[in-house]
Amino acid sequence: FIESKSKSLKGNEDLLSVSEYTGVTLKQDNVGEDEFLTNAASLIGYKLCKIGDLVINIMLAWKRGLGVSAYYGIASPSYAVYTPQKEINSSFFHYRLRNEDAIAEFKRNSTGIIESRLRLYSDSFYALSIAVPPLDEQTAIAAYLDEKSEKIDRIIDTINTQIYKLKDLRKALINDVVTGKIKVVSGGVAV
């Protein structure tokens, strides 16, 4: 990877954000109804980010605040944007650089007075040595993890739907009991 210094000249590209939970996402997908996309007066000078670039929030690399971008857009000037110098599987690197071993290395090589002030500067990032398999193996690993992650995400969605329905059921039960639709007698329920 080599650090990209390209900056937005117009500031009209999609604004990207970096999350410890999801990696690089479109900022507009994470903005609530009453929130602003940004407080910045202008996005001119924000760092350009291409699909496949590694984007690191240097203040949160130790907390998994990084990811390989699936988007073309712009990122905060305080982020580091790195472009791969050889052919890589972006999905593999997204998984590899966000796993526990890599995060521990980022934390160990970050500088700062206290944990909440740690920063992973480019010279420290370049000094890291992370094992990387050949491209065909990267592709196989990424495909396997993508497939398994998709299945797990579907299960999580199903469980979350069930939880939502159970909460509704509880709400309805409470309403029915307190409004007298269901009569409760000592030691049990009388319908």
Task: Tell me the role of every PLM-derived stretch.
Residues 1-11, 127, 131, 135, ...:
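Non-catalytic DNA-recognition/assembly elements of restriction-modification systems
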Residues 1-51:
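Sequence-specific dsDNA recognition surfaces
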Residues 6-7, 102, 111, 171, ...:
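Generic structural signal for secondary-structure transition and capping sites
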Residues 10, 105-106, 185-186:
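Short, hydrophobic secondary-structure boundary micro-motifs
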Residues 37-43, 114, 157-160:
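Short, solvent-exposed loop/turn positions at domain surfaces
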Residues 46, 51-103, 108-110, 114-115, ...:
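A short beta-sheet element
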Residues 132-191:
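Amphipathic alpha-helical coiled-coil/heptad-repeat segments
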